[in-house]
């Protein structure tokens, strides 16, 4: 481990995680459900750590907790969908945000794309992606994905998350 990395690790030990999480909550984000196809069953996870990475090629990234119950399935998938939720889809977000909730949901309206990724209906936008790679940093795994198809709806309002609350 180099000196800079060791220095950063010592600094982070001094930062209270509760307050650090509170500080990060001051950044308003959109809300997504990342979904994969596992033997023709819908598996999803609510994620607000979604970001554009590159326009050329079209790349995006998101991260999941290393201890997430379906992390192995996400690491092993080839294709996935990033569903950007609209303001009226708060219950979908809550369903997939639960830590110990069942992963297979039958009450979510969706269809499978040409690459068999689950696309949640009536979203603000949907991105169909091919997973390029993933890497572990801290307590999360960062997924880098190439966008291969997308849809969007200009007539919907976004679901936002700020200060640990939906807005």
Task: Describe each PLM feature range.
Residues 5-167:
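Basic, polyanion-binding surface patches
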């Amino acid at each position: 481990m180099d000196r800079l990395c060791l220095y950063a690790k010592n600094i982070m030990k001094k930062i209270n995680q509760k307050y650090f999480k509170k500080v990060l909550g001051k950044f308003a984000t959109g809300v997504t459900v990342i979904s994969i196809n596992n033997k023709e069953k819908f598996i999803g996870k609510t994620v607000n750590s979604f970001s554009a990475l590159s326009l050329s090629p079209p790349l995006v990234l998101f991260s999941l907790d290393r201890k997430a119950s379906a992390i192995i399935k996400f690491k092993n998938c080839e294709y996935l969908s990033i569903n950007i939720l609209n303001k009226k889809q708060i219950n979908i977000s809550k369903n997939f945000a639960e830590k110990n909730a069942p992963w297979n949901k039958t009450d979510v309206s969706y269809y499978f794309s040409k690459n068999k990724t689950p696309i949640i209906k009536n979203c603000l936008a949907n991105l169909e992606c091919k997973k390029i790679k993933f890497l572990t940093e801290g307590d999360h795994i960062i997924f880098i994905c190439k966008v291969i198809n997308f849809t969007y709806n200009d007539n919907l309002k976004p679901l936002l998350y700020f200060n640990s609350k939906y807005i």
